[in-house]
Amino acid sequence: MQGTQRGGLVPGLSPLDRRTLLFCNFILAVAWGQVNFTGDQVLRVLAKNEKQLSLLRDLETQKPQKVDFWRGPARPSLPVDMRVPFSELPSVKAYLKSHGLAYSIMIKDIQVLLDEERDAMAKSRRLERSTNSFSYSSYHTLDEIYSWIDNFVAEHSNLVSKIHIGKSFENRSILVLKFSTGGPNRPAIWIDTGIHSREWITHATGIWISQKIVNAYGKDHVLKRILNTMDIFIEIVTNPDGFAFTHSMNRLWRKNKSSQPGIFCIGVDLNRNWKAGFGGNGSNKNPCSETYRGPAPESEPEVAAIVDFITGHGNFKAMISIHSYSQMVMYPYGHSLEPVPNHEELFNLAKDAVKALNKVHGIQYIFGSISTTLYSASGISVDWAYDSGIKYAFSFELRDTGQYGFLLPASQIVPTAEETWMALQTIMKHTLNHPY
């Protein structure tokens, strides 16, 4: 399946031949187990101008597809990070050299980091079993997270409940934690993590924050004020199919796992599937692209479930979607360069959130609107939230800035979560103090 993502369809094959090829690839993948990334590297390029950015974008459209952008070509001031398969390294490096594009190697061998990550998880799992505990400083599988959710809700039923909001494409439960001190249809705050399945630090951060809420309530006067007036909803695994796949087969899978008749590349980018500038810049109509938008807005059950839930609730005041990596706090719009009506308020709130975050461990984040800070992105969740009347809509990009990328070591889970919590609390406090 990684092969179809890297290479797209083979030209000149009949539909039957294509199906046969894909079936053979599937059998081989099952036989071999997880996709191996030995020798794959992450290269960083700093484009000097728009022409060089265009040359980098051309790499993604080549067949076979030669690169997987971790930080795509956006603007000359931002570095471009791309994973290059070992087999494509000579041709990609030659391409860069021929066009005067200087590069550095951020990750020399991806598989080395993956092996370290897997070993750390195995060690943590043995310790958890021997002590009958759950480690908040380790990465976990989907089954482990869902089991933790059940235990967590049972232990803290006075403050937390579990809500089933729908089913994924592969029929997995989509679960949301509700933190509430009671009262019907109160003003609410939405937080989601893991919409892109390979961003494991976000799931781990969502788990840690959930535990922080129950531990701090009653001790933290700011949190107590928030929960005495508002409810907090956290969706820890927004893309359960993709997340399960990152553990079973392809650690670097980004999209969900939906398929369509007659289309042989799998998955939709769930953060391009919302009804907010759908199909515009920063999304892709090619099903083999990592930013494939899907056939229609809200076509994906994982997106539709959130839309139906938030719309049905009708009283959400803030929506925060947590991603990695790049160390940013951003607000709408992604699909337009036009500033939103309360741009100044969101700018100042993002600034305050970044200040609060920085005080914890000294980590520097940047902030601003999505389209001016990161890149143009259409059909994204926070744009939909803002257009739906949710005034305080933010997107976070957590650690780091590229040393590890999506493969952030587990040793950074707790510090990342601690600083993220302070930024979140800043936004929640502002939302509480500025009702609308």
Curated annotation (Swiss-Prot):
Gene: Cpa5
Entry GO MF terms: metallocarboxypeptidase activity; peptidase activity; zinc ion binding
Phylogenetic lineage: Eukaryota, Metazoa, Chordata, Craniata, Vertebrata
Binding residue positions for substrate: H196, S197, R198, E199, R254, N271, R272, S324, Y325, Y375
Annotated compartments: Secreted
Family annotation (PROSITE patterns): CARBOXYPEPT_ZN_1, CARBOXYPEPT_ZN_2, PEPTIDASE_M14
Cofactor binding summary note: Binds 1 zinc ion per subunit.
Sequence similarity: Belongs to the peptidase M14 family.
Cofactor (UniProt): Zn(2+)
Superkingdom, natural source: Eukaryota
Propeptide segments, given as residue ranges: 34-126
EC number of this enzyme: 3.4.17.-
Cellular component GO terms, alphabetical: extracellular region
Protein name listed in UniProt: Carboxypeptidase A5
Catalytic residues of the enzyme: E397 (proton donor/acceptor)
Record's signal peptide: 1-33
Record domain Peptidase M14: where: 138-431
InterPro entries: CPA_M14_CPD, M14A-like_propep, M14A_act_pep, Peptidase_M14
UniProt tissue specificity: Detected in testis germ cells.
Disulfide partners: C265-C288
Record's keyword terms, sorted: Carboxypeptidase, Cleavage on pair of basic residues, Disulfide bond, Hydrolase, Metal-binding, Metalloprotease, Protease, Secreted, Signal, Zinc, Zymogen
